[in-house]
Curated annotation (Swiss-Prot):
Positive regulator of myogenesis. Acts as a cofactor for myogenic bHLH transcription factors such as MYOD1, and probably MYOG and MYF6. Enhances the DNA-binding activity of the MYOD1:TCF3 isoform E47 complex and may promote formation of a functional MYOD1:TCF3 isoform E47:MEF2A complex involved in myogenesis. Plays a crucial and specific role in the organization of cytosolic structures in cardiomyocytes. Could play a role in mechanical stretch sensing. May be a scaffold protein that promotes the assembly of interacting proteins at Z-line structures. Pfam families: LIM. Changing residue 44 to P: In CMH12; decreases PKC/PRKCA activity. Phosphorylated by PKC/PRKCA. GO terms for molecular function: actin binding; actinin binding; identical protein binding; metal ion binding; structural constituent of muscle; telethonin binding. The gene is CSRP3. GO terms for cellular component: cytoplasm; cytoskeleton; cytosol; nucleoplasm; nucleus; Z disc. This is Cysteine and glycine-rich protein 3. PROSITE patterns: LIM_DOMAIN_1, LIM_DOMAIN_2.
Amino acid sequence: MPNWGGGAKCGACEKTVYHAEEIQCNGRSFHKTCFHCMACRKALDSTTVAAHESEIYCKVCYGRRYGPKGIGYGQGAGCLSTDTGEHLGLQFQQSPKPARSVTTSNPSKFTAKFGESEKCPRCGKSVYAAEKVMGGGKPWHKTCFRCAICGKSLESTNVTDKDGELYCKVCYAKNFGPTGIGFGGLTQQVEKKE
């Protein structure tokens, strides 16, 4: 029977949904205020919704209910689930394990797996990706990426390195460049013989 004068029915509350407040998902209409996960009641949008038949869920709840189960099928980083699967008729057997120390027993094993944070040669502190500038084959903080003599801020186009230190081209030429007549000025007095 046709629905005269009214809009579609909301998939959550079954009341009429008018066009101005309508969100469509999986062929069904919802009020904007009813577009919540049917398990945890979290507000949903087009990027966080996962539909199963006539029900809508957030991606985490959808994965818990309808995703693969068992060892090796975690919900991803940041999610901790203590669900044993009893509501699905699964038997969970936990084997006793010896207590382990929380601290890393072998730091070299940890650094081999996750990598050690790189250290800035100038200040000795860790250099993270957001502040990392490469110079002389080493990572530097943006604030430490300066000439060792004049303190001028450096860029990849005007940096030179010597013995693990960074210099601007001018300071490098003055201190380590060629010397003598024709190389940036006189470095020795030439005596005239009369």
